[in-house]
Amino acid sequence: MEIKNVCIIGGSGFVGQHIAHLLAAREIKVRILTRRREYAKSLLVLPTVDVIETNIHDPRELGQLLVGVDAVINLVGILDGDFISTHIELPRKIVGACEQNGVSRLLHMSALHASTNGTSAYLRSKGEGEKVIIESNLETTIFRPSVIFGPGDSFLNLFANLVKRLPVFPLGSPNAKFQPVFIEDVAEAIIASLSTPTTFGQSYNLCGPKIYSLRQLVEYVSTITKNKLSIIGLGDRLSYLQAMCLEFLPGKLMTRDNYLSMKMDSICDCNDESDLIKIFGICPTELEEVAPLYLVHNTPRGRYTGFRDRAGRKN
């Protein structure tokens, strides 16, 4: 199967922009569907990328914008809000639009441990969304990553910003486990599967090479950014109460449903060889290889260097 035109739904986000850049480098035409065109500023200069502002939840608009594409990648996901509309109804509309336009190839981003019996509404909705994809008549591939890190992420960068302001850090769910996976590894796996028939009808768990507790990740970020930090790990009850309080603050750093999601460790089965290696031949990138390169901008020296670079100074 030769893929020449790809539509990325939710392509203006962290993962979508990385995939779009890699596809553009391969001279594959990319159509980005997004709610806000300004979110994809870095893509506007790419000659093979077309950024279209649209209402992706409108079946008519969606159907019109899938005309002429060879494959669709759905990256739309939220951590808070209307999970049913975003994670279940939208995939159903995408499947319908693909069938309407003869687009047989559909790649779908889910989440590690997504299940109709999941510990949270988020994981259950992701599981229901997978069911919609699997039951379609399309050539589908589902990806279930752990937390994704890389330049521009909203995970390590969030902690980097918080530790600058909080010398004492009350950390909910400090023992929750994660297996962070590098954005470039995720993007390469998705692109590799586009035209690979052996990935049709399959689901892949994407994890990095190491497992960390949430406490270890926050401590690592504070070390890299040179911020002295005292972490107070909260037990289950206080973690839940913290999430409930944060849920009602602007920005929603945490919600009760996020807390419930973290009751299930975001790690791959330690008895299985990583799908990144086994299926895609990608050696998972260690967090320590990459994170310092972008977290350094959250240090006083790094911020000074960033300002100097933007001012065009070399010394």
PLM region descriptions:
Residues 38-100, 112-118:
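NAD(P)H-binding glycine-rich loop region in Rossmannoid oxidoreductase-like domains
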Residues 120, 141-160, 177, 212:
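Flexible, glycine-rich beta-alpha linker
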Residues 154-155, 173-195, 201-205, 216:
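Substrate-positioning beta->alpha
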Residues 29, 78-79, 84-136, 140-146:
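Conserved Rossmann-fold NAD(P)-dependent oxidoreductase catalytic core, especially the SDR/UDP-sugar
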Residues 237-315:
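A hydrophobic C-terminal alpha-helical subdomain
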Residues 2-26:
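N-terminal Rossmann NAD(P)H-binding glycine-rich loop of SDR-like oxidoreductase domains
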Residues 177-184, 204-224, 233-244, 283-286:
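Substrate-binding strand-loop-helix patch
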Residues 160-173:
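A short C-terminal helix-loop "cap" of Rossmann-like NAD(P)-dependent dehydrogenase/epimerase domains
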